[in-house]
């Protein structure tokens, strides 16, 4: 098993110059001091893993560089990881029903955006909750969510960083609401709230861009009701678009990387798993796979 030090040394650890303040390679003296203090206090408390600059700076940014609050957040995260089984979830959890779930709730990663981020697509408008409940449970869906987060952290982002030549810390999300009604939008937003809770508290500062496309009339009004539950920084990264979204997406995602169904030029052979199951990106390219190895799969195509 590869050591944490070897793993971190295998891909860039600095973001490009001019990235957001407080990111690796873009810190001032006060932020460096806070980073040093946080690491010292966590080491004194007995923590030995996940104390690298990138991780600690994410927790500090999430708490506006308040060391005490960042420490509390980190400690709560580590407690959750232990209780939820997060550290071993990639080995322990198998989502063999995913090919069936994908028919009623399409969720998938597909290539990268112009900043090198992995792009995650979620077709909420195609969700059929009645059929999904026959296949899986909410508990397993949440396990799947955490499994995917761990895959992003341990496989997708490192590979994307190697491909980009600099540290890639965040992902780009496209959530398609085509076909959804305003009456069911509230249940969709409820899911977003639950997913955001896990993201904000246990995977802070991982959202780069978040596009809600094909948003129905009145969706923005409904979304405002949920804003109080979301961190303001998170809200600033969310873009709500109607049916004329292609030009905005293409500003962020190269046409050759954007699936054709969303106005791009990327096509996937069904024999390779199709768009929903192929999982195409640097993390599946031998040139960018490091000592961690290729990302495991949570289901079998056989």
Curated annotation (Swiss-Prot):
The keyword Magnesium does not apply. It is found in: Golgi apparatus membrane. One of its GO terms (biological process) is Golgi to vacuole transport. Pfam families: CRAL_TRIO, CRAL_TRIO_N. It is a peripheral membrane protein. InterPro entries: CRAL-TRIO_dom, CRAL-TRIO_dom_sf, CRAL/TRIO_N_dom, CRAL/TRIO_N_dom_sf, PI/PC_transfer. The keyword Hydrolase does not apply. GO terms for cellular component: cytosol; fungal biofilm matrix; Golgi membrane. Its main location: Golgi. Keywords: Golgi apparatus, Membrane, Protein transport, Transport. Disulfide bonds: none annotated. Residues 97-270 form the CRAL-TRIO domain. GO terms for molecular function: phosphatidylcholine transporter activity; phosphatidylinositol transfer activity. Gene3D superfamilies: CRAL-TRIO lipid binding domain, N-terminal domain of phosphatidylinositol transfer protein sec14p. SMART domains: CRAL_TRIO_N, SEC14. Required for transport of secretory proteins from the Golgi complex. Catalyzes the transfer of phosphatidylinositol and phosphatidylcholine between membranes in vitro. This is SEC14 cytosolic factor. It comes from Candida glabrata (strain ATCC 2001 / BCRC 20586 / JCM 3761 / NBRC 0622 / NRRL Y-65 / CBS 138) (Yeast). The gene is SEC14.
């Amino acid at each position: 098993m590869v050591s944490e030090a070897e793993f971190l040394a295998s891909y860039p650890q600095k973001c490009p110059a001019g990235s957001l303040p407080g990111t690796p390679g873009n810190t001032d003296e006060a932020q460096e001091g806070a980073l040093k203090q946080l690491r010292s206090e966590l080491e004194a408390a007995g923590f030995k893993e996940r104390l690298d600059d990138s991780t600690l700076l994410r927790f500090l940014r999430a708490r506006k560089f308040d060391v005490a609050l960042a420490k509390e957040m980190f400690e709560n995260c580590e407690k959750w990881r232990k209780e939820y089984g997060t550290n071993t979830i990639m080995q322990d959890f198998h989502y063999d029903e995913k090919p069936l779930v994908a028919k009623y709730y399409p969720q998938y990663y597909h290539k990268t955006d112009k900043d090198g981020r992995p792009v995650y697509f979620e077709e909420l408008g195609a969700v059929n909750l009645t059929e999904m409940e026959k296949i899986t449970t909410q508990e397993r869906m949440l396990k799947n969510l955490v499994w995917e987060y761990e895959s992003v952290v341990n496989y997708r982002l490192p590979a994307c960083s190697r491909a980009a030549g600099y540290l890639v810390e965040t992902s780009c999300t496209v959530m398609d609401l085509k076909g959804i009604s305003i009456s069911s939008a509230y249940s969709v937003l409820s899911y977003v709230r639950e997913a955001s809770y896990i993201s904000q508290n246990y995977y802070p500062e991982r959202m780069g861009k978040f596009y809600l496309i094909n948003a129905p009339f009145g969706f923005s009004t409904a979304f405002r009701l949920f804003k109080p539950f979301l961190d303001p920084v998170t809200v600033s990264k969310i873009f709500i678009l109607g049916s004329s979204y292609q030009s905005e997406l293409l500003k962020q995602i190269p046409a050759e990387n954007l699936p054709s169904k969303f106005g791009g030029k990327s096509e996937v052979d069904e024999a390779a798993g199709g768009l929903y199951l192929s999982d195409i990106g640097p993390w599946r390219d031998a040139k960018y796979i490091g000592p961690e190895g290729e990302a495991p799969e949570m289901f079998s195509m056989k």
